[in-house]
Amino acid sequence: YDVESTDEDGWKKILVFLTFQHINFKEFISILCMWLKGRPKKSCITIAGVPDSGKSMFAYSLIKFLNGSVLSFANSKSHFWLQPLTECKAALIDDVTLPCWDYVDTFLRNALDGNAICIDCKHRAPVQTKCPPLLLTSNYDPRLHGVDSGGG
């Protein structure tokens, strides 16, 4: 990762944000390290909470810092919407809604577990690759409501 072009005091802003959100900094760093290494069953982080709490701002900043890609569930009808996963170090799916959670639960379980997946690529043969670490943001927490409960 290219950290030469970053703000030297940027970590202080992150610390302030995490403290404001009542997140233990040491625990977060430990989880982030496992996430970046792509450890099985530890390769997906979901940031869920109330609207306008800074989830997306934090996630976009982190993905930009990591030179990652942003995926949009709105493009999920295309066979190629996951193609950026073949070329990035980390990826973000922002604002995961209930239909997106259903899709993830049905079709992306191997990706979330950090296992190899097959991705259709435009003008190329399908590519089998290990899914990069995924970061998801959502106003809906499936741990509280369940994926198929219809609540939100």
Swiss-Prot record:
It catalyses: Couples ATP hydrolysis with the unwinding of duplex DNA by translocating in the 3'-5' direction; ATP + H2O = ADP + phosphate + H(+). It is an enzyme of class 5 (isomerase). Keywords: ATP-binding, DNA replication, DNA-binding, Early protein, Helicase, Host nucleus, Hydrolase, Isomerase, Nucleotide-binding. Pfam families: PPV_E1_C. Its EC number is 5.6.2.4. ATP binds at G49, V50, P51, D52, S53, G54, K55, S56. Residues 23-152 form the SF3 helicase domain. InterPro entries: Helicase_SF3_DNA-vir (IPR014015), P-loop_NTPase (IPR027417), PPV_DNA_helicase_E1_C (IPR001177). It is found in: Host nucleus. One of its GO terms (cellular component) is host cell nucleus. GO terms for biological process: DNA replication. The keyword Secreted does not apply. The keyword Lipid metabolism does not apply. One of its GO terms (molecular function) is ATP hydrolysis activity. ATP-dependent DNA 3'-5' helicase required for initiation of viral DNA replication. It forms a complex with the viral E2 protein. The E1-E2 complex binds to the replication origin which contains binding sites for both proteins. During the initial step, a dimer of E1 interacts with a dimer of protein E2 leading to a complex that binds the viral origin of replication with high specificity. Then, a second dimer of E1 displaces the E2 dimer in an ATP-dependent manner to form the E1 tetramer. Belongs to the papillomaviridae E1 protein family. This is Replication protein E1. It comes from Avian papillomavirus fpv-l. The gene is E1.
